[in-house]
């Protein structure tokens, strides 16, 4: 049986990689992927604690986070496509101004 510490260390590493991607990258798609990585790290933490406690609450929470992440990805991708069609770029520094 794998100790919970390993799961939590993996979740922390995934979350840090996602945070690094959000803070450093300039491409909107990479930022969305980094946010998804951070949400998956939270899911791993929920499931690890649920396994440790022996209940299903963490699994239910992870399921809802997955549903919210899917909606966020769909809406975010639609916004990125709309911005790319209107401006021709998806770099975040080009999106700082709201002027067309």
From Swiss-Prot:
Q: Name one GO biological process term.
A: ATP synthesis coupled electron transport
Q: Which UniProt keywords apply?
A: Cell inner membrane, Cell membrane, Membrane, NAD, Quinone, Translocase, Transmembrane, Transmembrane helix, Transport, Ubiquinone
Its Gene Ontology cellular component terms are: NADH dehydrogenase complex; plasma membrane
Show the catalytic activity: a quinone + NADH + 5 H(+)(in) = a quinol + NAD(+) + 4 H(+)(out)
Q: Which GO terms describe its molecular function?
A: NADH:ubiquinone reductase (non-electrogenic) activity; quinone binding
- The EC class name is translocase
Which branch of life, at top level?
A: Bacteria
Identify the EC number(s).
7.1.1.-
Q: Which InterPro entries match?
A: NADH_UbQ_OxRdtase_chain4L/K, NUOK/Mnh_C1-like
> Membrane-spanning residues where?
4-24, 29-49, 63-83
Matching entries from Pfam families are given as: Oxidored_q2
Subcellular location per UniProt equals:
Cell inner membrane
The entry sums up its family as follows: Belongs to the complex I subunit 4L family.
Provide the protein name. NADH-quinone oxidoreductase subunit K
What is the gene name? nuoK
């Amino acid at each position: 049986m794998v100790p919970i510490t390993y799961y939590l260390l993996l979740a922390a590493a995934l979350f840090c990689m996602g945070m690094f991607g959000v803070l450093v990258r300039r491409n909107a798609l990479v930022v969305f992927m980094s946010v998804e990585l951070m949400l998956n790290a939270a899911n791993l933490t929920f499931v690890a604690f649920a396994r440790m406690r022996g209940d299903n609450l963490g699994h239910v929470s992870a399921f809802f986070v997955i549903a919210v992440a899917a909606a966020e990805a769909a809406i975010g991708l639609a916004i990125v496509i709309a911005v790319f069609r209107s401006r021709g770029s998806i770099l975040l520094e080009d999106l700082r101004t709201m002027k067309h």
